[in-house]
Design a protein with these regions (language model features):
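C-terminal and inter-domain tail/linker signature
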Residues: 1-136
């Protein structure tokens, strides 16, 4: 695939799977052998693990929205600079729902092969997110 096609795949990944919560689209865009280098506790391997992560975050933040600010592609990799926003309405990392609106930023790098996401790396501002969720 071209770098533009790879970027389009990642745009669709965020728009349809994460923002519109159309989890079935993962079957089209994510490889069965998908590997996360940033797994959640208890996340299984493969596409089941990808779906697990989406469901877990959407349970904690049902109105989750991810804004893609930049996509940079080279060969079979796409890097994305992102901002996530949501309302904490379900338990997250042992923190009971607070009802607070939160926002955190991150960078993700995707490896694409045969038109599907096969692995990804992530770096999110977890400290900033946890500070927003904790009592002040």
């Amino acid at each position: 695939m071209s770098t533009e096609a790879n970027k389009a795949l990642i745009r669709r990944h965020f728009a349809e799977i994460w923002n519109e919560y159309q989890l079935h689209v993962a079957d089209e865009l994510v490889s069965p052998s998908y590997h996360s280098h940033f797994p959640l506790p208890g996340q299984p391997p493969g596409i089941a693990g990808f779906k697990f992560a989406v469901q877990a975050l959407r349970t904690s933040f049902p109105d989750l929205s991810i804004t893609v600010h930049d996509l940079i592609a080279e060969d079979d990799k796409v890097a994305a600079r992102l901002t996530a926003r949501g309302t904490h309405q379900g338990s997250f990392r042992g923190i009971a729902p607070t009802g607070r609106g939160v926002e955190w930023s991150g960078i993700r790098i995707f490896h694409i092969a045969d038109g599907k996401i096969v692995e990804h790396w992530a770096n999110w501002d977890d400290l900033g997110l946890l500070q927003q969720l904790s009592a002040r």
